Amino acid sequence: MMMFAIKKKAVSVAIVSIISSLSFAASAAPTATANGGTINFTGKVTDVTCTVKLNGGTNSGTVALPPVSTASLAKSGDVAGMTSFTVSLDNCKSAGATLAAGKTAAVFFEAGADVDSATGLLLNHKASGAGAVALELVDNSNSSHHAIIAGDAAQQANTTKIAIDPQGTTILPYAVRYHATGAATAGDVESSVVYSVMYN
């Protein structure tokens, strides 16, 4: 366990606050041309820090999915083996003091080497592993179990925000499942993702 402010860690975790605030359109910004334009960026830096644990352990770890048959992943879009995991927050503070009421948190799953940039699925990086199989992250906070598109900024609006209680703790529920990208072939599956904790 350790306190995190703005820090990342690969594999099943990483943590922290949110992207720094930027404005790309300064007063001296060049005039947009017919072939270009202006991009404005916004963000927020918070002073919230928490102790972050994956499934009650440390901030990094492994989530093991159950073995499934190729028959359950026979065609593109088939899913199987949904496995729950949690990211828990403890000792959350703001500038060293107790958090004000109404603070919420959610995980943002980031783009990376194991993330398919088109679909947000986690790619199988196991050499000679299962074919036509990826992993799909899921918001497990309610029965809808909607898929999370890793690396997509829309997560900030679409992922359920969970309240941080007055004691500075909360549990963020997620899941992962196999997702067929075709007719699956047998073999091992391994992947990873980096995540950050979004505080609001």
Q: Predicted segments — roles?
A:
Residues 2-12, 24-200:
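Mature extracellular/passenger domains of Gram-negative fimbrial/pilin and adhesin proteins
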Residues 13-21:
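Bacterial N-terminal signal peptides
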